[in-house]
């Protein structure tokens, strides 16, 4: 192999040659819109997580109220069972969602 011939084929570039110049106003506006909290995937996800947290807290408070009031009638016992089942289902759903999301993130990281 002739090193002098290989050197002639290589291009030497500087950072100034690689830069594309300043971004246009349309590109900057599009970037800002994409990175904004409202309407972005991350913002929507955080909003949904906040709503799930509120519903979960509400269900726990309802169960606490039902457990604090003594009662032997079947209606109140069924209501307590329903509240407990709802909390359990929400916990399972959250656990499965988080597990799937972390699995998807791991897959994404492995492919890059």
Curated annotation (Swiss-Prot):
Signal peptide: none annotated. Disulfide bonds: none annotated. GO terms for biological process: protein secretion by the type III secretion system. Pfam families: T3SS_basalb_I. InterPro entries: T3SS_YscI/HrpB (IPR012670). Disruption phenotype: Deletion mutants display a reduced cytotoxicity toward macrophages. NCBIfam families: yscI_hrpB_dom. Homomultimer (through its C-terminal region). Belongs to the YscI/HrpB family. Component of the type III secretion (T3S) injectisome that translocates effector toxins into host cells, facilitating the establishment and dissemination of infection. Polymerizes into flexible and regularly twisted fibrils and plays an essential role in needle assembly. This is Type III inner-rod protein PscI. The lineage of its organism: Bacteria, Pseudomonadati, Pseudomonadota, Gammaproteobacteria, Pseudomonadales. The gene is pscI.
